[in-house]
């Protein structure tokens, strides 16, 4: 459902009201880029600019004003238009009004990025960009970055917002020693800037402060993937850690979706070479090759046993860059065909399965409980103090 501009603005205001009761976090942005020069432009609101904790302009920066920052000799050179302001170790842009938005643009990043609230840039061995932003605005940005285009259902966005919020709070101290909470790359969660999609904002608003906890009231590990291939995987088989809420189960909701099936052709000798290199010359024999040319997974198998060898299907997936480790093998002439199911590691929530469940009328809490065993959805304020 597409939202009207009026409703979109209402959701922005509603989220802002909720944000008064929310937490702020520090997210390192542009973390995968080594940016030497960047333009910081004010899009909306007013910003006070501090350089080494001192205010350098009498008036706040207003929309359309821009500052150029250049990393030089382990310091940050600051310019406003053709005017040289100075060289500093730390720069801060602090929003002073409602709806403060700025952009970052550089020839060294893929596209212009838009962010909300505050920004701090510190000179280390490179420029370190930290967006100080409200938790709920960050969550909406994560959902837009990770799943925009996969669905238009608000109920699905509620699921993703709850999953992302749970992950964020469970990993809040991951980068604390480096001066921030999370980075914007997939190492933490993909975060490419502010959310501009009304349906995602609504999903975040309607699931405000919801998190997923296990039977002991601890935040869970919210593993998810694109498609389970009809069966989710047990976390223990992938990560060698027993997790009572991440168990293997039949998932008919993922069947028939876009990423349900795949196929890959591999030259016969290349397939043989993998086994010879990893497990020895015995795989040059016709007897061994007969086994590696005829392998069936009716259910997910993490370990493929051939005589005395235990072969990880995950290793095969990684080596051949497969969509999943859930595949069967067929030999035709000089080519090995892998007939696979699913996309991703298969642990936890299947995004395409969840989308199907939403279409069938399941609530977002029912869907979460289907993919995560014996869990509850609560408000994070019940278990965490900021």
PLM regions with names:
Residues 3-16:
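Sec-dependent N-terminal signal peptides
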Residues 8, 19-386:
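Conserved, single-site charged/polar hotspot
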